[in-house]
Swiss-Prot record:
Coiled coil: none annotated. Belongs to the glycosyl hydrolase 32 family. It catalyses: Hydrolysis of terminal, non-reducing (2->1)-linked beta-D-fructofuranose residues in fructans. The gene is 1-FEH. Disulfide bonds join 447-493. Glycans are attached at residues 169, 237, 249, 568. Keywords: Disulfide bond, Glycoprotein, Glycosidase, Hydrolase, Signal. Hydrolyzes inulin-type beta-(2,1)-fructans. May play a role as a beta-(2,1)-trimmer during graminan biosynthesis. This is Fructan 1-exohydrolase. Inhibited by sucrose. The keyword Cell inner membrane does not apply. It comes from Triticum urartu. Residues 1-15 form the signal peptide. The keyword Hydrolase applies.
Length: 597
């Protein structure tokens, strides 16, 4: 064990945590030829199109086991489902290059959520109602095992409406071809108070107790952001309900809404169209302000409305699906294993010029099982179990003691492609620093101000990953523990400020708080999956999840990156169990698939 904490010197952060200046701002309305969910200002900043991709750069940063096409641009997941033995992942895709535009529905299939076969696009821009783009949508499986896609299309004037498509041949196990309904669009924003350029991203449909289908669509109604509610007898003819499923005055337009049922303390998934067990809750998710937020509540069947358990006017305090580079998520009920799975889009945080040099841009996070915590207050997430099939070369350590300033190197795993699970046991909780509730408004700012180099009572402790030999490049994923009047609060941070020597990158310090009963359980868990330029971390059993994109030069030096466990807090931290694996490369859209062409 080395006393080597000197590498974490204080870092100049000049606005690195000021999200209003540091991050691209997601906006509403038509954008760069269309907008259908999860687009932002950076999409318009396109570099010259005649730049040739660099194989070396593409290989250095391209992931080994995350979902992404073989080349070109991708963004939102759209319509994931399990059908006749295959998982289907549709996604927003530009077949013509690694920049936003010409959006169609990419399509891949898998039997295990890990290895994917890339197919021809399922939907392309070829009708008046979607000539501007085949934007985000969902898949619903109708009675009799009939899948139907409902998606947002933009016309030549960029007005948005909802369209439907059916598989041409349901006996085709891959469902390669889809036929659009002759009466598209089936749903227009033609009622008073609606905004025709803020009407998109329909949810999966569900059947109510009256036998009618329901569906929510993101939109604006009389200046309110809303999940607009519609009903239908046949999934073709829709009528707007007089009131939204839920609305809010004061937030930006809600993109990519999602609505599903969950059971407290039970990771079994629920089909919203089936009978919902007693005691179940409902989650309403919306993509807004560059992040994915959600509320927990109940679905009032009499009112046909979502009622949150806690009404929070300040949207900065709304719960988050992920505290990092994660947007436009989509979930589905996996009937194969009786679980709910969620994906999100993780955009690049370098530049459009870099994307052209790489020849690709964007990826989807590892599929996650999502369920409700025992206390019913928040959602928990964990990578699907199938990803563990890529684990190899396990190393394990027990009984590590980390005093202030200690580093423990985790050797004999590929530091570029690794899965690390570690538990931190607190010998004492008496040294916890006091908690300031105002920090909840901007945990990223607090992570930036109290970085891993600033000692605390309990913490920071965690992992240093993708570290170069001399530590001039490294990323820190860590915890700090605070004591409020009645409970303990844990801050989880993913600090990218020294992740790369390159100056032209977004390098924030992401962060989120979660409550933890340290009187009952003294061990805080951390799982971090490292996949070259993508890092996903799950803290406290999935209470806080942070997706980060990093571009260190050390990725060019095979075998030269390092992983460490560390502690820089006054209180000693014990590691009862540490396990790490090298992750094998998955086959993602490269074998005999259209996307590999």
């Amino acid at each position: 064990m080395a006393q080597a904490w000197a590498f974490l010197l204080p870092v100049l952060v000049f606005g690195s945590y000021m999200t209003s200046l540091f991050f691209p701002t997601y906006i509403s309305g038509p954008l760069c030829g269309g907008d259908g969910g999860g687009r932002s200002l950076f999409l318009c900043a396109q570099a010259p199109k005649d730049q040739d991709p660099s194989p070396a750069v593409s290989t250095m940063y391209k992931t080994a086991f995350h979902f992404q096409p073989a080349k070109n641009w991708m963004n939102d997941p759209s319509g994931p489902m399990y059908f006749n033995g295959f998982y289907h992942e549709f996604y927003q895709y530009n077949p013509n290059g690694p920049i936003f535009g010409d959006i169609v529905w990419g399509h891949s299939v898998s039997t295990d959520l890990v290895n994917w076969i890339g197919l021809e696009p399922a939907l392309v821009r070829d009708t008046p109602s979607d000539i501007d783009g085949c934007w985000t949508g969902s898949v619903t499986i109708l009675p009799g095992g009939k899948p139907v896609i409902i998606y947002t299309g933009g016309d030549k004037d960029q007005h948005q409406a909802q369209n439907i498509a059916f598989p041409k041949n349901r006996s085709d196990p891959y469902l390669r071809e889809w036929i659009k309904a002759a009466n598209n669009p089936v749903l227009r924003p033609d009622e008073p108070g609606m905004n025709s350029i803020e009407f998109r991203d329909p949810t999966t449909g569900w059947i109510g107790p009256d036998g009618l289908w329901r569906m929510a669509v993101g939109g604006e109604l009389n200046g309110y952001s809303a999940a607009l509610l519609y009903k239908s007898e046949d999934f073709l003819n829709w009528t707007k309900v007089d009131h939204p499923l839920y609305s809010h005055n004061g937030s930006n337009m809600w993109e990519c809404p999602d609505f599903f049922a969950v059971l407290p303390g039970n990771n079994a998934g629920l089909d919203l169209s089936a009978a919902i067990p007693q005691g179940a809750k409902h989650a309403l998710k919306m993509s807004v302000d560059s992040v994915d937020k959600y509320m927990i509540g109940v679905y009032d069947l009499q009112r046909d409305a979502f009622v949150p358990d806690n009404v929070v006017d300040d949207r900065r305090l709304w719960l988050r699906i992920d505290y990092g580079t994660f947007y436009a998520s989509k979930s589905f009920f996996d009937s194969n294993k009786n679980r709910r799975i969620i994906w999100g889009w993780s955009r690049e945080t370098d530049s459009p010029s870099d994307d052209l040099e790489k020849g690709w841009a964007g990826l989807h996070t590892i599929p996650r099982t999502i369920w409700l915590a025992d206390d019913g207050k928040q959602l928990l997430q964990w990578p699907v179990e199938e990803i563990e099939s890529l684990r190899t070369n396990e190393i394990s350590h027990q009984g590590i003691e980390l005093n202030k300033g200690d580093l423990f190197e985790i050797k004999e795993v590929d530091a570029f492609q690794a899965d690390v699970e570690i538990g931190f046991e607190l010998a004492s909780i008496d040294d916890a620093d006091p908690f300031d509730p105002s920090w909840l408004l901007d945990p990223e700012k607090h992570c930036g101000e109290a970085g891993a180099s600033v000692p605390g009572g309990i913490g920071p402790f965690g992992l240093v990953i993708l570290a170069s030999d001399n530590m001039d490049e490294h990323t820190e994923v860590y915890f700090r523990v605070y004591k409020s009047e009645e409970k303990y609060m844990v801050l989880m941070c993913s600090d990218l400020r020294r992740s790369s020597l390159r100056p032209d990158l977004e390098k924030p310090a992401y962060g989120g708080f979660f409550e933890f009963d340290l009187e009952k359980e003294r061990k805080i868990s951390l799982r971090t999956l490292i996949d070259r330029s993508a890092v996903e971390s799950f803290g406290g059993g999935g209470r806080v999840c942070i997706t980060s994109r990093v571009y260190p030069a050390v990725l060019a030096d095979v075998g030269r990156a390092h992983i460490y466990a560390f502690n820089n807090g006054s209180a000693t931290v014990r590691v009862p169990q540490l396990s790490a694996w090298t992750m094998r490369k998955a086959q993602v859209n490269v074998e005999k698939g259209w996307s590999a062409i």
